[in-house]
Structures are given as structure tokens and as C-alpha cells.
Amino acid sequence: MNIHEYQAKALLKSFGAPVAEGVAIFSADEAEAAAKQLPGPLYVVKSQIHAGGRGKGKFKELGPDAKGGVRLAFSIDEVKSHVAEMLGNTLVTNQTGPAGKQVNRLYIEDGADIERELYLSLLVDRAVGQVAFVVSTEGGMDIETVAHDTPEKIISVAIDPEAGVTAANLEALTAALLLEGEAKADAEKLFPILYKAFVEKDMALLEVNPLIVMKNGRMRVLDAKMSFDGNALFRHEDVVALRDKTEEDAKEIEASKYDLAYVALDGNIGCMVNGAGLAMATMDIIKLYGAEPANFLDVGGGATKEKVTAAFKIITADPAVKGILVNIFGGIMKCDVIAEGVLAAVKDVGLTVPLVVRLEGTNVELGKKIINESGLNVISADDLDDAAQKIVAAVKAA
């Protein structure tokens, strides 16, 4: 689960991290009052969407020369002008896809005199089984380019969970970021705070980009992105309360009601598979034969007929889907249950696109018999390779 920047900063502030003063607004009428709460004279107006690249993004409704999703303002009138342009419009960034995201809230923040922009994040390093700091002296809007072109500029420091952030860890991090004086002292206070917040709130990612050194030598968290482990949310009602469902895909929200692992993608072949590994292999082979998957959908090992029906409905709710591939290897999952669920869904929602079904495993013959005797236009496949070729061909021919 993700939250907005202003929410992430409020959470970090509660742990003692240095963040700028700011006010979130939801309508243009709130702009002037919000700006008056800040010291000024420099203000920053920030679009609040669950995607990065906001500064370089463009609004669909504005011209190509219009400013992006993060703007500087040097007066309250300029704040109001930016708010009027940004709020309610659609911001397209390198992370939103061409559809973009509607900006329904803005964060007006006190400006800062920036001397240096650094990058910092915390994540779970699965290679070592520990939380790791990832830092770079090259912070800001071009961090993806830095990671691609000069990966040696990105340093990782793993933290022993028993010891926590040690003096040696702090020395390694501050040295990697070339910090000294007050900035180094601030960092030595800040980094344990960030680690504590990450662990206590069961985060999957905490990204501060940029982490700045101001001209007065002090440090500040200028931007913050947080993602939380969905499996641990039951322990954090305060975090769940921050969820903004308008930023999430409606199909993913519906899937979560049935404990289905669903991720919307940009292709046109819907997939329903049992098992994450098989689901990824299914997506790979669709791409191998020249098409693109419309989703990742793992129905799990203990799916019921009702769960399968719900999964099918979620797939067909996507107007981009031009064909569906059902790929089931029945172990715990029984092929006849899948077959009954698919047929029930087809009868319920109708079938206007090609459907290929590949079944293997427990009760496979019964499952195939149910499908073959249904009288519905369902294409049967012998194996995964055969299934992928058939669905790609059917979609191209449609």
C-alpha cells in the first residue's frame, strides 16, 4: 500500500525527522489560506499522486510548454495561479503511463535554499536478508538515469537487525554521501530515525529523494515516498486510514476482496493462472509469441468456484482485454473446479473475446470434459506453448 507525500512526511515528522512546513489542500479555495500558514517568500506547489517523476511530468489539459507537477511560487498570488492550473487536471509522468493520474490534492510547502541534493532509500535487500540503506550523492529527478548509466555512484549499506544502525553504518553512509560538519551531525541523527520508522511501520520501501543539504548546512527531507507491506497492515490501523483508493486500480481493489493477487498491466491478453511462478511464466510466453499480457492474476491454490468466477469477471471488466488465457496446473487446485468457475462466469458475464483454457493436474480429464460438453466457444490447449500460440493467434485474427 502506498501513501501520499504529505502523509509520509507527517509520519516521518512524528518520528522526529526534519521536514518542511506544509499544508495539503483539496480545492482551489484553500490555496490562499494554506500559503498564509507558511513562512514564505518561496513556496512549492506539489501534485499529490502515487507516482514518481512529477517534476518532469506534463498535464494533459495544458499545452506542451506548461510547467510540470511540482512548481515554485514566489508569492501567494502565484501559488493560487498554480493551484488553479494543476488541481483536477491529469498529470502524465514516466511512471503513470500515457493515461496519467488526476491530481485531486496538492501539497503547498515552504521552500528551501538547496545546496546539495542527495538520494536515500530503505528497502529489504533479499540477497542478504536485511534492511539496507541505498544512497547516492546524485539525488533529484534524474536518479533513474544515474542508476542506469553510473551504478557505481549508488551505495548500499545493510543493517544488522540485532544491532540496528551502528556507528560503523553511520560512518559508511555519511562518507558515501560526502557529508561533514552540521550536515553529518544531522545525518547521524536522521538515519536511525528513518530505520526505526521503516521497521516499526512494516514498510516495503522508504524513499527520500531528494534528501537535501541546505545552504545553512542543515539537512531536510524534501520528498518522501512510502510503500507498506500489505501483509502487515492489520497491525497498523493508522496507516490503513491513510489509504487513498482513488489512486488505485478499481480492478485491483475488487480483486483484494476475494484475496486474488491481481496487477493490471498494459497489454490485451487477460490471464488467469494458479501460482505466481506459473503466472509469470504465462506472461513471459505471451510476450514470446508477440503479444502483451493485460494483467497478472494468481487465483491461488485453494480457489473456489465463486473465487474463479470473480477472477473472470475482473479480467473481462478491462476494456483493453481482447482475449483470455486460463492456465491451470492442478495440485491442491482441482481442474474441474476451475472449469466450473470459468463456465459459470462465461454464462454470467458473456464471452465476447476468444478464450483459451489449458488444464493439467488433479481431475484434468473431468475438467476438460466439463468444458468440452458445455457447448460454449472455448478453445482447449494441450500445453502452455500450445495455449500461448492459440490465444495470440485468436486475438490477432479477431
UniProtKB/Swiss-Prot annotation:
Amino acids binding substrate = 274, 331-333
Cofactor binding description: Binds 1 Mg(2+) ion per subunit.
Similarity annotation: Belongs to the succinate/malate CoA ligase beta subunit family.
Q: Which organism encodes this protein?
A: Allorhizobium ampelinum (strain ATCC BAA-846 / DSM 112012 / S4) (Agrobacterium vitis (strain S4))
Role, per record:
Succinyl-CoA synthetase functions in the citric acid cycle (TCA), coupling the hydrolysis of succinyl-CoA to the synthesis of either ATP or GTP and thus represents the only step of substrate-level phosphorylation in the TCA. The beta subunit provides nucleotide specificity of the enzyme and binds the substrate succinate, while the binding sites for coenzyme A and phosphate are found in the alpha subunit.
Q: Mind listing the GO biological process terms from this record?
A: succinyl-CoA metabolic process; tricarboxylic acid cycle
Q: Name one GO cellular component term.
A: cytosol
Q: Does the keyword Plastid apply?
A: no
Catalysis performed (reactions): succinate + ATP + CoA = succinyl-CoA + ADP + phosphate; GTP + succinate + CoA = succinyl-CoA + GDP + phosphate
Q: What subunit structure does UniProt give?
A: Heterotetramer of two alpha and two beta subunits.
Name the cofactor(s).
Answer: Mg(2+)
Its pathway? Answer: Carbohydrate metabolism; tricarboxylic acid cycle; succinate from succinyl-CoA (ligase route): step 1/1
Stored InterPro entries: ATP-grasp, ATP-grasp_succ-CoA_synth-type, ATP_grasp_subdomain_1, Succ-CoA_synthase_bsu_CS, SUCC_ACL_C, Succ_CoA_ligase-like_bsu, Succinyl-CoA_synth-like
PANTHER family hit by this protein: SUCCINATE--COA LIGASE [GDP-FORMING] SUBUNIT BETA, MITOCHONDRIAL (PTHR11815:SF10), SUCCINYL-COA SYNTHETASE BETA CHAIN (PTHR11815)
KW Glycoprotein (keyword) present:
no
Q: Where does Mg(2+) bind?
A: 209, 223
Q: Which residue numbers delimit the ATP-grasp domain? A: 9-254
Gene Ontology MF annotations: ATP binding; magnesium ion binding; succinate-CoA ligase (ADP-forming) activity; succinate-CoA ligase (GDP-forming) activity
Residues the entry annotates as binding ATP: 46, 53-55, 109, 112, 117
Name of the protein: Succinate--CoA ligase [ADP-forming] subunit beta
- EC number(s) on record? 6.2.1.5
Which HAMAP family does the record match to this protein?
Succ_CoA_beta
